[in-house]
Amino acid sequence: MRRHMVTYAWQLLKKELGLYQLAMDIIIMIRVCKMFRQGLRGFREYQIIETAHWKHPIFSFWDKKMQSRVTFDTMDFIAEEGHFPPKAIQIMQKKPSWRTEDEIQAVCNILQVLDSYRNYAEPLQLLLAKVMRFERFGRRRVIIKKGQKGNSFYFIYLGTVAITKDEDGSSAFLDPHPKLLHKGSCFGEMDVLHASVRRSTIVCMEETEFLVVDREDFFANKLDQEVQKDAQYRFEFFRKMELFASWSDEKLWQLVAMAKIERFSYGQLISKDFGESPFIMFISKGSCEVLRLLDLGASPSYRRWIWQHLELIDGRPLKTHLSEYSPMERFKEFQIKSYPLQDFSSLKLPHLKKAWGLQGTSFSRKIRTSGDTLPKMLGPKIQSRPAQSIKCAMINIKPGELPKEAAVGAYVKVHTVEQGEILGLHQAFLPEGECDTRPLILMSLGNELIRIRKEIFYELIDNDDEMIKKLLKLNIAFPSDEDMCQKFLQQNSWNIFRKDLLQLLVEPCQSQLFTPNRPKKREIYNPKSVVLDLCSINKTTKPRYPIFMAPQKYLPPLRIVQAIKAPRYKIRELLA
């Protein structure tokens, strides 16, 4: 009987405990659901996924905490990459007189991504933002037809258009290399200003978005006065140049009508190869640099410099490199250091190593650096340091063999173009055999330039012998790649020496620097600092995986470096 009562009590307790655990689980789930509801309260009735609800994109809900109604517009969060923003479209649907100053400024800020719009002066930018309207056209739509009078001019916000000489624009889809205008370009401005007839046809190659300025709005808001001010500025700039001193005002105005002002910020790329550019550029303000992407591996000077410095990778003292003992001195030193044990086999070892190093070439080559000057001993007291063996992959180039890791490139400054100088005419009248065909990059240092197409300029100077004589004097002889490579190596040696000297003279920071948990692995090429460290050429490290790596089509053909850390003597030995 007693056993039965104990068993019944245990079953009852077990049942009650199970009910208690179930109740606790339900309470925890309720609390978790409540937390989720509070966290996602702002996303209730979120209608952004289904396109059917885009007809009513604005919804609202009552916020108990704030005691107010919160309104949410889903159209503000729709991502349409590259398209003109819906808010700006709504502003441009208004008449110019109905647009507020804040709306005009908002449109002006959005249009700063367009290069052609940004080149206008700030007052003219605001006037254009006030009168613009938005248009979107599909593929094969003819925007401007040849022979018609110009009533509008256009800014391309998205898409591509082609320029053709036929009336319907069909040749653009048959030509393998049509003349194209992309986002940021504009066309039709001068035709609107002078009410001239269109000389070409513009057709859409894909769905394209335009910002259009009509002729009526153009003159009603006095945009012609601002455009005339820019034209007067270009005229005065050309008139001050000695090159156009013999031209009449009428002929100079023809040049002004075909020229355009463009502004570039510091470090902005102007042209990847201005020698192949179809434009002539007059620097009206600021300055720019001519750069050359130099393939260092193709230079004999760079190859000799690499091999000279790789011989120092063993880290021997300075005296052992500067002085080489004569055979008699080496024999006397051997007798002193090797007494009573003598091993004559090591006397010719350094010379044999030099001879072995010159025999044969292969893709993978071992660079044997010189060991210590002490001979190889049979006894345990005096031991010579073994020669260090460096194994690296080799490539065969025109000057000779070069370690694969050392085949890099560098951007070298060739020339600085100042205000008043001209680019694009330095080889205009040279024979084809004497022209410099190397690609030269033009980078802005914060400048303003005036562009004009070469064919238009050549038409204006046709049969003008005096002008041609002046242009022949503008020829610029840029240095050869070999000279630029030698200058780069000299500058690099000085920069590395200066850094070594600063590290020696400047006291290190007393406070302990923060060290990350994951130790940084030394690599021969550091893409962040753009430095090639040849001292680590023989050290094997595991490859590091960066968070982001640009596609190869966006990268230059060579690994770009700004400095090369080569094996070198210690700075203390040089100053001793």
Curated annotation (Swiss-Prot):
Gene Ontology annotations of biological process type: spermatogenesis
One cellular-component annotation, GO: cytosol
MF terms in GO: cAMP binding
Subcellular location: Cytoplasm, Cytosol
Record SMART domains: cNMP
One Pfam assignment: cNMP_binding
Binding-site residues for a nucleoside 3',5'-cyclic phosphate, renumbered to this chain: 116-239
Top-level taxon in the UniProt lineage: Eukaryota
First and last residue of the signal peptide: none
Listed InterPro entries: cNMP-bd_CS, cNMP-bd_dom, cNMP-bd_dom_sf, RmlC-like_jellyroll
Physiological role: Essential for male fertility. Plays an important role in spermatogenesis and regulates sperm motility by controlling the development of the flagellar bending of sperm.
Protein name: Cyclic nucleotide-binding domain-containing protein 2
Organism: Homo sapiens
